[in-house]
From Swiss-Prot:
Domain of life, source organism: Bacteria
Gene Ontology CC: cytosol
Keywords recorded for this protein, A-Z: Aminoacyl-tRNA synthetase, ATP-binding, Cytoplasm, Ligase, Metal-binding, Nucleotide-binding, Protein biosynthesis, RNA-binding, tRNA-binding, Zinc
Positions annotated to bind ATP: K333
Species name: Legionella pneumophila (strain Corby)
UniProt gene name: metG
Localisation: Cytoplasm
Residues binding Zn(2+), per UniProt: C145, C148, C158, C161
GO molecular function: ATP binding; metal ion binding; methionine-tRNA ligase activity; tRNA binding
InterPro entries to which the protein is assigned, alphabetical: aa-tRNA-synth_I_CS, Anticodon_Met, Met-tRNA-synth_bsu_C, Met-tRNA_ligase_1, Met-tRNA_synth, Methionyl/Leucyl_tRNA_Synth, MetRS_core, MetRS_Zn
Official protein name in the record: Methionine--tRNA ligase
Reported cofactor(s): Zn(2+)
Pfam families, sorted: tRNA-synt_1g (PF09334), tRNA_bind (PF01588)
Oligomeric and partner information: Homodimer.
Residue span of motif 'HIGH' region: 14-24
Length: 670
């Protein structure tokens, strides 16, 4: 199957100051399924993404860790790419906004906006941290809400009463970074004149480029009136300098969406593809963005206006999805439901999640809930019990009784055609992003196949040598029907599809390859394609997620204040002792915990320490370290912890304290 259509598809860029979590994966799995669907149709569908690598949070986190922002973002990019690969999320190019391509494009767009009279300079007043000597973004100021008097609220909105306000409206404002009281200062900023493009945006947003819910929301914003958009930030800042303007930088939200263009530009340079064919104002290609509902304002207003004003094409569509909740609630670190991708991967197969998300995504802006009982049921009953079971039941007979060769006839062409007739429905559902509808149809087809096998009972017929031809024909039918099902599921389950192609001894499956069944065809020995979800694995994942919070070595943005000082008498209450590690073993079922037996000279104590990822058990045995010997024992799921070993941490690594030569077990640390 081939097509003349050419498509460029993007997902929102993950921010490069932390690891991916399951909330990120909703969008990237949604995008990947859509792209794979179109590639199977023979369409030139290119998908690009990259890390959003600029801004104050990255600058501050790098400073806290004692590394450069470039080093931080490079490390996080590797982590993101590793997680995406593990979940079979396959971008044609994955880049970073901190790149020469992005700087060149951001500069070009800014200069075109400036030449067109779309850039306005204004003097603004904002909070300034006198200790850090920097202007403070809204989220880096906290204080008492001016509306309801709730304390410890951010500088842009109150999480208690929902009020929005300016940071300067806060009562008793404090810098989150240093703890100092900020002062108001003036600064000249650069603004994009968004109201100038109100009519263009009204026209664009009402022409089918957005979901109906998003269009309706934008109508509210139009009624409230569009405002000029501040696209500059003051030094110090990690980003691209504004050309010819000292100590001014492009705001991260100016160059972040341009990162889509930059990633594609890099792809074009390496593959010999025409960049202008996809981004020229008169382009006949298609451009699609997948984004979360929290950033729709940027993608449905600022972005198309900025593109149009600078002479580039606007998106064909912006597809918006809702948030991920877990067990009906916002993801929570304390409950262990703030689950990072790598914590999930330590316990569960990535395609369980791909299937579950697909079964819940419907093309609307609804939130998606991850309910673990439902998760187990859908994977075990539907995916394993219905689909994989078909291949498992039929392949055994073909492998053992018929030398791995399928029959030369298809005994139920009507049933084969019945499943084949669902193809257009399934494709249409995937293309319209109603994956849940596609999955329901596929499972209905799987039910028909299982009913066919149950009705014909090849396991009973196999006991009668005279019925072996029937067994051969029934199981050949089952294998071919499974082939249709796995083709339908291939955009969702690419890893299982690849394993199925190897089992079927076939070319890569696509939408047209199932027109003809496999007859008189030799297959390979069947190997399990997927196993059932064990609830214990989910529980272990949740435990690991909680432990990840408990063993976090540092807390970000916590200034040392006078209120945190203790007296020498308080410090003297802590009994610090030199301890020898006489035994160390990783705790089974815990991702970070190591069980240590510590010798204090006159006694031994058991301690559970979150150092499993930093050290091998063998290298710890015999080492001296420092422990808190008089800490109240704490009962954990794995046993009683009778103290605490001391370690340093920078957020990326953990380093046990070790005394100089001459220290011995039991020696008091003073």
């Amino acid at each position: 199957m081939t097509s003349e259509r050419k498509m460029l598809v993007t997902s929102a860029l993950p921010y490069a100051n932390g690891h991916l979590h399951l909330g990120h994966l909703v969008e990237h799995i949604q995008t990947d399924i859509w792209v794979r669907t179109h590639k199977m149709l023979g369409i030139q569908c290119i998908s690009v993404c990259g890390d959003d690598a600029h801004g104050t949070p990255i600058m501050l986190k790098a400073e806290q860790l004692g590394i450069t922002p470039e080093a931080l973002t490079a490390e996080i990019k590797l982590s993101h790419e590793k997680d995406f690969k593990a979940f079979a999320i396959d971008y044609d190019y994955y880049h970073t906004t901190h790149s020469p391509e992005n700087q060149a494009l951001a500069t070009t767009i800014f200069e075109r906006l400036q030449a067109g009279g779309d850039i306005v300079k204004k003097t603004i007043r904002q909070f300034y941290d006198p200790v850090k000597q920097m202007f403070l973004p809204d989220r880096y100021v906290k204080g008492t809400c001016p509306k309801c008097a709730a304390v410890d609220q951010y500088g842009d909105n109150c999480e208690v009463c929902g009020a929005t306000y300016s940071p300067t409206d806060l009562i008793n404002p404090v810098s989150v970074i240093s703890g100092a009281s900020p002062v108001e200062m003036e600064s000249e900023h650069y603004f994009f004149d968004l109201p100038r493009y109100e009519e263009l945006l009204k026209d664009w947003t009402r022409k089918g480029h957005l979901q109906t819910e998003v269009t309706n929301k934008l109508s509210e914003w139009f009624e409230a009136g569009l405002k000029q958009w501040d696209i500059s930030r003051d030094a110090p800042y990690f980003g691209f300098p504004i050309p010819g303007v000292p100590d001014k930088y492009f705001y991260v939200w100016l160059d972040a969406p341009i990162g889509y263009m930059a990633s594609f530009k890099k792809y074009c340079d390496e593959r010999g593809v025409s960049f202008d064919e996809f981004w020229d104002k008169a382009s006949k290609t298609e451009l699609y963005h997948f984004v979360g509902k929290d950033i729709v304002y940027f993608h449905a207003l600022f972005w198309p206006a900025m593109l149009a004003a600078s002479g580039f094409r606007t998106p064909t569509a912006v597809y918006t999805h809702g948030f991920l909740t877990v067990e009906g609630q916002k993801m929570s670190k304390s409950r262990g439901t703030f689950i990072e991708a790598r914590a999930y991967l330590a316990h569960l197969h990535p395609e369980y999640l791909r299937y579950y998300f697909a079964a819940k995504l419907n093309g609307r802006v609804d939130d998606l809930d991850l309910n673990f009982d439902d998760f187990v049921n859908r994977v075990n009953a539907d995916l394993v019990g219905k689909v994989v079971n078909i291949a498992s039941r039929c392949a055994g007979f073909i492998n053992k009784r018929f030398d791995n060769r399928l029959s030369s006839e298809l005994i139920n062409q009507k049933l084969y055609n019945d499943l084949l007739s669902a193809r257009e429905f399934v494709i249409d559902a995937f293309v319209s992003r109603d994956y849940a509808r596609a999955i329901r149809q596929i499972m209905d087809c799987a039910d028909k196949v299982n009913q066919y096998i149950d009705a014909n009972k090849p396991w009973v017929l196999a006991k009668d040598e005279s019925k072996l031809n029937e067994v051969h024909a029934i199981c050949t039918m089952g294998i071919n029907l499974f082939r249709i099902l796995i083709t339908y599921l291939k955009p969702v389950l690419p890893m299982m599809a690849k394993a199925s192609e190897e089992f079927l001894n076939s070319e890569p499956l696509h939408w047209g390859s199932i027109d003809k069944p496999l007859l008189n065809h030799r297959i390979n020995t069947f190997k399990p394609l997927m196993v059932r979800v064990e609830k214990e694995k989910i529980e272990a994942m949740l435990v690991q997620s909680k432990e990840s919070l408990m063993t976090t070595p540092i807390k970000e943005n916590t200034p040392v204040e006078d209120s945190n000082l203790i007296s020498i008498e308080d410090f003297a209450k802590v009994d610090l002792r030199i301890a020898k590690i006489v035994n160390a073993e990783p705790v089974e079922g815990a991702d970070k915990l190591m069980r240590l037996i510590l010798d204090l000279g006159d006694a031994q104590k058991q301690v559970f320490a979150g150092i499993k990822k930093a050290y091998d058990a063998e290298e710890l045995i015999g080492r001296l370290t420092v422990m808190v010997a008089n800490l109240e024992p704490r009962t954990m799921r794995f046993g009683v912890s009778e103290g605490m070993v001391l370690a340093a941490g920078d957020g990326q690594g953990i380093y046990l304290l070790q005394p100089d030569a001459g220290a011995f077990p039991g020696m008091k640390v003073k």
